[in-house]
A protein has these predicted regions:
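Alpha-helical transmembrane segments
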Residues: 3-20, 75-83
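Physicochemical signature of membrane-embedded alpha-helices that form the seven-helix bundle of GPCRs
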Residues: 10-13, 48-51, 81-84, 108, ...
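Transmembrane alpha-helical segments that form the membrane-embedded catalytic/substrate-channel core
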Residues: 13-30, 86-96
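Cytosolic, membrane-interface loops and tails of multi-pass inner-membrane proteins
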Residues: 23-49
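Core segments of transmembrane alpha-helices
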Residues: 53-65, 120-121
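Mid-chain, well-packed structural core segment of small domains
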Residues: 62, 68-98
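Interfacial loop-to-transmembrane junctions
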Residues: 91-119
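Juxtamembrane boundary at the C-terminal end of a transmembrane helix
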Residues: 124-136
């Protein structure tokens, strides 16, 4: 068993993205003078949800990919999963700040969450298949 250094590298970049999302929420809270909730402000609500959505998906996916990497999955597959996650998490918040009828909404928000869920399912199925095959 080895340390999941590939996953760790991507996690460092994802952590910076997460910090950027948090800073955006703080900036909007200060600008709109809203301490709790979203103050019925659509921009603040979008920023809060982009930040929360990241926190809802990234930890479990990163944990699963780290486990796959530690179990000896090929470096190329680890890079593929983590690069897809990074792309998805870059796209999703961009789509949160545009109108729902725009092409940016469909490509960024819808595409970002679709790619996120695809990586989530792929990582889960890879773990299950490795367990079924007796690979630990």
């Amino acid at each position: 068993m080895h340390l999941p250094s590939i996953t760790a590298g991507y996690l460092a970049v994802l952590a910076l993205l997460y910090a950027g999302l948090a800073i955006q929420v703080l900036r909007l809270r200060r600008g709109y003078r809203v301490l709790f909730g979203d103050g019925d402000n659509i921009k603040l609500r979008s920023a809060i949800r982009a930040h929360a959505n990241f926190a809802e998906y990234v930890p479990i996916i990163a944990l699963m990919v780290a486990m796959l990497e530690m179990s000896g999955m090929s470096a190329m597959r680890v890079h593929l999963l983590m690069a897809a996650l990074l792309l998805a998490r870059l796209l999703h918040p961009l789509g949160m700040y545009v109108g729902p009828r725009s092409w940016q909404f469909h490509i960024c928000r819808v595409g970002g969450i679709a790619l996120t869920v695809t990586v989530l399912i792929a990582a889960a199925l890879l773990i299950l298949s490795r367990l079924a095959a007796g690979i630990s």
